[in-house]
Design a protein with these regions (language model features):
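Amphipathic alpha-helical "coupling" segments that flank catalytic cores
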Residues: 1-697
Length: 697
């Protein structure tokens, strides 16, 4: 018999929640629901969470209207504790009482831990409605907020005061109460806008979960965040077109505005053209960082003296625009003042002020760090044998790289670090190549950001991150769990991505040693060798994850087991192995696993030529190996890993047949030793390219 089901709706109406509170609640609600309903044995379909600043909503599809009966086996106390001299003890009596059965109904069961009493717990399922009030109250009060508040004389804590509750199973009201608010069918429309079916004071009746989104949409509330985001983008594009411009799209701003409005409306604002004399990025940052406004470009690509603001109402647009314009002009005026003051002083002369900023109390000031970066960038360039002009550009860029940190503009807009350094450098006559280094050395800023576009910028970017990594690791400031205050994981990935993107074939150990030497005047906790070992493991873990995002895991692990110190080399080998299909990799892995295991007992030395009477498979494998060994040496030296692994894959079936036809551990000790040497030679020769025994795992 198919159980009867109904859709569940819970809407928690609140005073305006901060955007981050809405997002956190919508992440938590479905999991809280699934967990509680699992505990109650309530079967259900899909679970959805919707929300705006004024409401958090849970919809559960096809919730069973009745619990199933429960019958489960429960293990109780050990028999030796349950009975004494044949009579039941209090332990046995308590266990029987818990299960609601007689002691005679309990069974003795032998387990690995001894003999235990076992009984059956039976529970008749109850109507779902009997459990829902308490369950929904529990879920609601379990929603995590960064900071909760109490209101009135009550003791309930929530993100913001609860204003109304709608709770329905099908079309039946679930009777519950939280903080003096009783549930019903009455929700609220948009705070300022009304629609059909909405009372003058903004009340709207919800009849069931199926029509909930449509009912609110008619009341100017877009409860589904995904729908709200789509509508916001459509209206932004439309407003930009009407203004004669092109929207500067920004997913971050869509996300930022999403939980600030219940129905997105767009207003076009503007400011004086004179402000366009500021660097474009400054204007966009003023609009984005402080106001959450979108920028506009003219069809020719130049910035327009306009912005788009997402607002929560279509009423009084002129009044809203006037207020927004006043605020935008004030912010731009501040930025123009900062820019004017900053450009009065050459960037290079600001460098000494970096001595007043502490990078890390044991590792010194930002000036000390800047000096280490300048030295290290050249060391890395020499290790990579880059041309002298690149080294000079890197050195000049590194010298200026941190100077904008003491500028007024960066003090107000930290997101513009590097960007302003580049702008000021260009304005003061620094070459474009050097100015670009100032900006590029902050790249990548995150997983979605590109790495430095020039070799000089890449050198300084790597030097900056390596200095931080080596310094922090050397004084014990390593990431622990989710805590990574110095962003060391991100810095590590930045170094690796830069090396791979620029094609820098650099040994990590050489880079670590060069960076460590820059701390000669700092008392460190780790020796250079210990630092290199510990940081090498940290990098290897990150490199593994980076490569496995695009390449088969077995190929990556096989290569990192051999060349984790050279990321570019490791990637090239893993890519070559990945060109072999999964079945081929598995076959190679299987035969080399066997060869490697056997080789562990093998003596050193050149394998002997098989005797004339040897099995053809033994002769074929031996001759093929000699040819393979010669080819692999040439292919590896030339970097032709595709050819090398193709040859190994072609050799694998011969080795597999060898194992079928030949007994390696022959009774003849001399013959056994020769065959063992062959296994060792095969394993060691091919093992210089990758741990082939790890393939196919």
């Amino acid at each position: 018999m198919v159980p009867e089901t109904s859709d569940l709706l819970l809407e928690i109406g609140v005073e305006e929640l901060p955007a981050s509170f809405v997002e956190a609640a919508l992440r938590a609600l479905p999991e809280l629901c699934k967990k509680r309903f699992a505990e109650l044995r309530l079967v259900h379909g899909d679970v959805h969470a919707y929300g705006t600043p004024r409401r958090l909503t849970l919809i559960v599809e096809k919730l069973a209207r009745h619990q199933p009966d429960l019958e489960e086996e429960v293990t109780g106390p050990p028999v030796k504790a349950a009975f004494k001299d044949g009579a039941p003890t209090k332990a046995a009596e308590a266990f029987a009482t818990k299960l609601g059965c007689a002691i005679a109904d309990l069974r003795r069961v032998e387990t690995p831990k001894g003999e235990y009493l076992v009984g059956t717990r039976r529970e008749v399922g109850q109507p779902t409605m009997a459990h829902l009030p308490a369950a929904l109250v529990q879920m609601t009060l379990a929603i995590p907020f960064r900071k909760s508040m109490r209101w009135g004389a009550g003791t309930v804590a929530f993100g913001r005061p609860i204003q109304w509750l709608v709770a329905l199973l099908g079309e039946e009201v679930i009777d519950l109460e939280i903080a003096g608010i009783k549930s019903g069918t009455t929700s609220r429309s948009h705070r300022f806008l009304r629609g059909p079916g909405v009372t003058p004071n903004g009340e709207v009746t919800i009849t069931n979960a199926a029509t909930y989104l449509d009912t609110l949409r008619a009341a100017h509330v877009i409860a589904d965040p995904e729908e709200r985001a789509r509508l916001m983008r459509e209206r932004l594009l439309s407003a930009a077109k009407e203004a004669g411009g092109v929207l500067i799209e920004d997913d971050f701003l869509i996300h930022e505005n999403l939980s600030l409005v219940e129905e997105p409306h767009v207003i076009v604002g503007g400011y004086e053209k004179e402000f366009l004399e500021l660097p474009e990025r400054v204007i966009l940052e003023v609009a984005k960082g402080h106001q959450r406004y979108f920028g506009l470009r003219s069809p020719d690509g130049s910035l327009m003296p306009n912005y788009l603001a997402v607002v929560n109402t279509a009423e009084n647009p002129a009044l809203i625009r006037r207020g927004n314009d006043i605020t935008m002009r004030a912010r731009l005026s501040d930025a123009r003042f900062f820019y004017g003051e900053d450009t009065k002083t050459p960037l290079a002369t600001r460098r000494e002020k970096l001595s007043g900023i502490v990078f890390q109390k044991r590792l010194g000031t930002v000036l000390a760090k800047a000096e280490r970066i300048e030295r290290l960038a050249r060391e890395l360039g020499l290790l990579l044998m880059l041309p002298e002009p690149t080294l000079m550009a890197a050195a000049s860029g590194a010298h200026l790289a941190k100077c904008d940190l003491v500028c007024l503009m960066v003090g107000e807009f930290p997101e513009l670090e590097g960007e302003m350094g580049k702008a000021y450098a260009l304005k003061q006559g620094v070459s474009p190549e050097v100015a670009a280094v100032i900006k590029e050395h902050y790249s990548p800023k995150g997983a979605g950001d590109s790495t430095a576009a020039s070799d000089a910028g890449a050198l300084v970017a790597m030097a900056d991150r390596l200095d931080t990594l080596v310094g922090c690791f050397a004084i014990g400031l390593t990431p622990t769990g989710a805590a990574d205050p110095y962003g060391l994981r991100r810095a590590c990935l930045g170094v690796l991505r830069t090396m791979l993107d620029r094609g820098f074939d650099l040994r990590l150990t050489d880079a670590f040693r060069a960076a460590y030497d820059g701390f000669a005047l700092v008392k460190l906790d780790l020796s250079r060798d210990d630092l290199v070992k510990k940081l090498g493991e940290f990098f290897s873990d990150r490199l593994k994850g980076l490569l496995e995002a695009k390449l088969p895991s077995d190929a990556v692990q096989a290569c990192l087991a051999v060349v984790s110190d050279r990321p570019l080399d490791a990637r090239a080998r893993a890519e070559a192995i990945a060109h072999l299909d999964a079945a081929t990799r598995a076959g190679v892995g299987e035969v080399f696993k066997r060869a490697t295991n056997i080789a562990g007992n093998a003596p050193a030395g050149e394998p002997g030529m098989p005797a004339d009477e040897a099995h053809p498979s033994e002769k074929a494998a031996y001759q093929a190996f000699l040819a393979l060994r010669e080819r692999l040496g040439h292919l590896a030296r030339s970097g032709d890993f595709d050819g090398a692994f193709r040859d190994i894959a072609a050799f694998a079936p011969l080795l597999a047949q060898y194992f079928v036809d030949v007994m390696v551990m022959a009774d003849d000790l001399k013959l056994r030793e020769s065959r063992l040497r062959l296994m060792r030679a095969i394993s060691e020769t091919c093992g210089t390219l990758a741990r082939l025994d790890l393939l196919g795992g």
